[in-house]
């Protein structure tokens, strides 16, 4: 028996999309619904062995993903169609595998990532929406998207984001490098698009909450820069709701050659 060879282990990466409105966040937790738990259950059924997944970004309760990336290891040799169509057949309708790729041993969905990108969608109309109520955040006061965009540009670069960091954040440092931030209007929709090497807890939603104050002319354009410099969470606005937030893309070194599907969500082009 001692001469038997162990089965080879395969490392697989998946692109995942999900509507987070009915889940208590990404991370598996006891007695509440999580995206991770549903995905691991479906993968384990296809692999016929227990599967544990690692993700690029652990989204909070109510937050959505169109560009989430995960990896897992398995001794099960399956065709790509099993990891896509097969897993999707075992998933609830609000979670889906979008792509599959066999990856090198040194790939890690979280630690190999060089940047994450989020988009926050605001439905800016006097009356609330019904069809996309859980996919957008409703804000009834008229917003000046161009004003919001100008105010946000001070956040680009490496900065201390203490003013936009949740009190319970467990990150060792508040410093993050924002590579891109824009605010654009598409009819009644206002979209905040932000890319950074990583994010402190609630960073995007806290930034959006303060940008809403600028867009509604409750605060001057200079206010965002003042908040950034103050390094005081209590001075900034309330945290924006989870419903409008999407993890839309994760960047990795080119050598991993991962698929790059359209970011979206919905009608939004890249």
Curated annotation (Swiss-Prot):
Family recorded in the similarity comment: Belongs to the tRNA pseudouridine synthase TruA family.
Function, in words: Formation of pseudouridine at positions 38, 39 and 40 in the anticodon stem and loop of transfer RNAs.
Entry protein name: tRNA pseudouridine synthase A
Keyword check for tRNA processing: yes
SUPFAM superfamilies assigned: Pseudouridine synthase
Listed InterPro entries: PsdUridine_synth_cat_dom_sf, PsdUridine_synth_TruA, PsdUridine_synth_TruA_a/b_dom, PsdUridine_synth_TruA_C, TruA/RsuA/RluB/E/F_N
Positions annotated as active site in the UniProt record: 60 (nucleophile)
Coiled-coil residue windows: none
Originating organism: Salmonella arizonae (strain ATCC BAA-731 / CDC346-86 / RSK2980)
Keywords: Isomerase, tRNA processing
Protein EC: 5.4.99.12
Catalytic reactions on record: uridine(38/39/40) in tRNA = pseudouridine(38/39/40) in tRNA
Gene3D superfamilies: Pseudouridine synthase I, catalytic domain, C-terminal subdomain (3.30.70.660), Pseudouridine synthase I, catalytic domain, N-terminal subdomain (3.30.70.580)
Binding positions for substrate per the UniProt entry: 118
GO biological process: tRNA pseudouridine synthesis
Molecular-function annotations in GO: RNA binding; tRNA pseudouridine(38-40) synthase activity
Stored NCBIfam families: hisT_truA
Subunit structure: Homodimer.
Classification via Pfam families: PseudoU_synth_1
